[in-house]
From Swiss-Prot:
GO terms for MF: structural constituent of cuticle
Keywords tagged on the record: Cuticle, Repeat
Record flagged with keyword Mitochondrion: no
Swiss-Prot/TrEMBL domain comment: The tetrapeptide (A-A-P-[AV]) repeats found throughout the protein are also present in many proteins constituting the protective envelope of other species.
Summary of the function given for this chain in its UniProt record: Component of the cuticle of migratory locust which contains more than 100 different structural proteins.
Superkingdom assignment: Eukaryota
Repeat positions for Sequence: 7-10, 13-16, 20-23, 26-29, 56-59, 62-65, 68-71, 75-78, 81-84, 93-96, 123-126, 135-138, 141-144, 156-159
Protein name: Cuticle protein 38
Amino acid sequence: GYLGGIAAPVGYAAPAVGYAAPAIAAAPVAVAHAVAPAAASVANTYRISQTARVLAAPAAYAAPAVAAAPAIGYAAPAIAAAPALGYARYAAAAPVAVAHAAVPAAASVANTYRISQTARLLAAPAVAHAPVAYAAPAAYAAPAIGYGYGGLAYGAAPVAKVY
């Protein structure tokens, strides 16, 4: 996209710190996930696709009906897939927790569920790196029924894989 094929100088690469918009500030998270190997666990694919969708449409927080439709509008899981082991995505994902924390308390139940899941994973990277050993509590066992994820098989997938 540059005239004459001139490469973009290094100065165009901006750090996450210093951006005002939460969705932009968290861009490095999406980049870090996208470059991860495609051999991902189902649980990681679900978590990352959910995070990417929320970051890409922050306005959805103001419209619970839209935010409660996870099947619409997020990138292909195969592209954003991340491995269950072996790279430090949690340090890079810190802006996600900040962006979620700024959401008004009147958020939809679906948003509350997603935010709690993200916060739990960010707060325990050592445990999240060994998802098989982390058994999902019974409270997380029915997201499709209580949070409107639109299908028991889809909604229960992360629980079956365990975090």
